[in-house]
Amino acid sequence: DRWKTLEAWPAPVSRIEKLYLGETTLNAELAEGERTFVYDPENPVPSHGAESVLTTIAEAGSLLQPEPDYRPDVVSFVSAPLEKALPICGQIKVHLNVSTDVDDTAFTAKLMEVFPDGRAYNIRGGITTIAADLPEGQTYTPGQTAKVCVEMWDMNWTVPRAQRRHRLVEDRGVPRRPRLPAVRRSQQLRRSLV
């Protein structure tokens, strides 16, 4: 680790990289596919490591994460090993096409660095709801496809060569984010752009 000094923050954008979600992978090319999971508010996904100022000091920061798809309500997408180091500077946005069987729900996304031995550490995360991304005055109709964007705080991080990027999508990270008191429901990710 090392500190870097920049003349302005966020740093000026020099290049935008788009990655697409495949069935279980992060790809440079658009891939067809969808993933489905069921969110149970009685068994929320626990948060572990975060950049939020609202967590306990023991749970803050970049921490070792569970294996990809360690729960049926967590879907993971992992890139191929990087051929060269990848600097990430600025904001990360995860664009998803989603569908659910309730009036509103939340989606979280987490970016992780995966080491060659399989260990994964969180880098950044964010959350949004379907309602937050709808034009003002519009409501979501269960079963329709909606576009949502999970925005993450600006950052400056370099993922070393031979490491992989891991994108995780889930409904909640409790206690960092409160659970929604909704009924058990099905979530569907459709051809999602990252």
Label for each model-derived stretch:
Residues 1-194:
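C-terminal, loop-rich substrate-recognition/catalytic regions characterized by aromatic stacking residues
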